[in-house]
């Protein structure tokens, strides 16, 4: 398969170099971050005993590549991870896509032992340099739709103080060189995922999510929008239906998820509420019915009724849910309120699971390169499909109201402002 049309732009970039850009850890802590006095902390304790055989610290490399990530994943990341794993050098990996300072893939690699870190880093640098030399992205993000999109996201997602760290001389977001890569600090979002135990669980899940997306990129025609949207919707239904077995709880979650993505960017043209009803109607009856069958199968624990690809995801989602429930019941999850005002220590899985489900869904969609509009639309589609099938309240399904949008400010809803610039999503 070929890269998307953007990669055929006529201005090739310079060759790959690991550049020495700014250190993201120097950015100020956002309002939704974790203040020094917070109990939400990371796993590293200076007084902890050293274990030579324990996994090393995560390495983070940002690969600035203004094209489809598919060739980067299949021709570089997967072979690199496979080789390092086979040689006993790697304890884990995952990736996310991001746009800050230009479109890039954030690759996270955890050495099997601390002593392996230099080798893992060198091997990653060598593989990335070779790939970018042989398959450079030809599109430059200097003007046009993508530049405007990134500038809009920059304004919406970061405070004025945070933006100052990333401004160029022209007052716009600084762009890193295309076809380059940089080592950056790894900065887990402890407040979002529930502290060190929650971050460890998220990292385990992120590898499964990354593996799934790499396999989908290899075996499916994800360059076709219909295929991509259909896959994402089914994955969302599997995981959300596994986490939330009660129809009403699931519908409430989907409504809030939709309302957040739709309302957070309501001042832009990146969501289109007026088109949801028409697009849903044009789907016909077969797709909504498929979503309802998926929901029924996972709610009943009858994953053998699912296609193999979804069955594996359902089994992983169930294990992820069980591990999250165990952490909750032990009191090992501590979240930070989105306004940064307090810590939240849930002891009831009914409270904790939706708080984790939001970023879990979003980050899998991120790896699939889904857009803001996609997330708003698909959560609307899934909720409406369930309502049309009789789930929850027997009322006519409509797009969530302003009251529903307001509810996203409560615990468990995503936040669009004041995110950590080096965070994991």
Each language-model region and where it sits:
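An acidic, charge-biased composition feature
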Residues: 1-8, 32, 38-425
